[in-house]
Every structure is written in structure tokens, then in C-alpha cells.
Amino acid sequence: MFVGIDVSKDRLDVHLRPSGEAFAVARDGPGLEALAARLSAAAPALVVLEATGGFEQTVAAALAAAALPLAVVNPA
């Protein structure tokens, strides 16, 4: 499974492939904890975050702390 995360100031839009599942979480402490727990349980092959002027840094740190495979990419 692969995970793509669209990062914005207040929220993270999360998309799982190939299942097509999508959900959103707040970009705050409780939201990041819930996201890390949910993704850890799913054991993705890779989580890809959009680089968005620094908003992605706390997200990347939380997911890395959960030992999730992670890539931060520039938006197209």
C-alpha cells in the first residue's frame, strides 16, 4: 500500500492506494498521533508528503518517529 498526503496549514488530506480510501486529520498533535497510529497499523510500503513551505516538517517528524517509510517531494 502507498499513502499520499496533501499538507496544508490546518489539515492533512490522506489518500491510500490501491484501496482508494481517503480521510483527513488535523495538522496538530492529536491529529498527528492518530495518523501515525493508523498508518503504522496499515504498514504502508511508502508514505509520500507534499513539501509545502515548512508545514510538512512536523508531519514528517511525527511519521519518522513512528518508523514509517517516508519521502517528502516538491509539488508538481
For each of these PLM feature ranges, what is it?
Residues 1-76:
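Phosphate- and other anionic-substrate recognition elements at nucleic-acid/protein interfaces
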